């Protein structure tokens, strides 16, 4: 997979994108992004449905959601997991960091 993005031209309104992509290794991807100037929005977090997720904002203002599929979870197990406090806390953390970031807007990049 390849994703091509480019900066806004002179005089253009800011046009940041919100990208959600699956990667082989969330932690390695996040490390590479921060080494290139990205700011972490959401630390790597395992979620009940079997994905590890993280978010970062790149120097051009684009918000990246990176997912790594860790395991397949059957519906019965998923229901059980969502009853666990750790799963609820993880979802609240992931949702909260997004809400906080979106409240910052592009100027907060």
Say what each PLM segment does.
Residues 1-57, 67-109:
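Vicinal oxygen chelate
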């Amino acid at each position: 997979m390849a994703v091509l993005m480019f900066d806004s031209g002179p005089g253009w309104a800011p046009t940041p994108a919100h990208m959600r992509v699956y990667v082989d290794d969330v932690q390695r991807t996040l490390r590479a992004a921060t080494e290139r100037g990205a700011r972490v929005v959401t630390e790597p977090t395992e979620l009940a449905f079997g994905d590890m997720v993280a978010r970062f904002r790149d120097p051009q203002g684009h918000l990246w959601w990176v997912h790594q599929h860790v395991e397949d979870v059957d519906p019965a197990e998923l229901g059980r997991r969502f009853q666990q406090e750790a799963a609820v806390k993880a979802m609240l953390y992931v949702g909260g960091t997004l809400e906080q970031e979106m409240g910052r807007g592009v100027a907060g990049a």
